[in-house]
């Protein structure tokens, strides 16, 4: 049994909140750079160039990449041989978010209730997903989620008679309905299977997968590639002004489901699909 003090968790979450909001993962930066080179028309090429300049400026000036610093979504893999001491785990995660958004001078975007809309003033509470896994470590992934793209996401409960084409049509329809609202080029997270809630979780988790990494199961890998081709043929472009680059990647995650259902969820990420991770 290994003891981990909540102080380490607080510090790690604080650092990850700041890092995720100011430095985009290298693979996504590279993908945006490649997309800029592939654009041939003047306007989309200029826009993609401006996005790259913004990424560089955020890093150099130690500023957030985007003014919407998101709702803090935290994926926590907690080893079963870990004993957390000094306090409560979820309280520690939320304290880390509070410190990260306060000390990092990040916008506070969370309201305490959907109807009274009073700001909590420290971007808490976070959305926390915890799994108990083998081992004696804690892996934390912080994924701040802006709501320009979140608001464009959808879920549909298909029946088992739905075909692969039906599922792909749903993803494509979701992207077309979104248009330029999610600040394309987008990263498209897709979840198939599970139940109503788990399907949405899969789509969200898919956004944390590197954009250069395809699904290992051939049928889903082929769907990712075909969907990316179809989405980029829509000419929505960056940021809705036309062009070859509407999406940078389509990431699909799938899970077992009930014999009577086939849930499908699409969680859209903008070109600033942020995440940072650390293992304690």
Regions found by a protein language model. Give the residues of each.
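Non-transmembrane, aqueous-exposed alpha-helical and coiled segments at domain scale
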Residues: 1-190, 195-280
């Amino acid at each position: 049994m290994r003891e981990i003090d909540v102080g380490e968790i607080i510090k790690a979450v604080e650092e990850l909140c700041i890092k995720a909001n100011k430095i985009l993962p290298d693979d996504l930066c590279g993908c945006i750079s490649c997309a800029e080179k592939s654009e041939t028309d003047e306007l989309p090429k200029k826009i993609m160039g401006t996005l790259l300049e913004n990424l560089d400026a955020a890093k150099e000036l130690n500023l957030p990449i985007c003014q919407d610093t998101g709702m803090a979504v935290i994926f926590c893999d907690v080893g079963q041989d870990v004993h957390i001491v000094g306090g409560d785990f979820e309280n520690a995660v939320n304290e880390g978010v509070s410190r990260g958004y306060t000390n990092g001078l990040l916008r506070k975007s969370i309201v305490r209730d959907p109807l009274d809309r009073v700001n909590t003033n420290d971007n808490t509470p976070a959305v926390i997903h915890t799994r108990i896994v083998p081992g004696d470590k804690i892996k934390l992934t912080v994924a701040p989620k802006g709501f320009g793209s979140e608001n464009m996401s959808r879920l549909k409960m298909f029946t088992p008679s739905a075909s692969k084409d039906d599922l792909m049509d749903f993803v494509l329809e979701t992207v077309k309905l979104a248009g330029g609202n999610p600040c394309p080029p987008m990263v498209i997270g897709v979840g198939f299977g599970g139940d109503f809630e788990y399907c949405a979780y899969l789509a969200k988790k898919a956004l944390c997968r590197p954009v250069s990494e395809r699904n290992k199961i051939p049928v889903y890998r082929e769907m990712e590639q075909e969907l990316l081709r179809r989405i980029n043929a829509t000419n929505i472009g960056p940021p809705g002004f036309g062009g070859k680059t509407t999406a940078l990647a389509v990431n699909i995650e799938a899970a077992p489901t009930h014999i009577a259902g086939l849930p499908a969820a699409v969680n859209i990420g903008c070109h600033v699909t942020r995440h940072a991770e650390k293992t304690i």
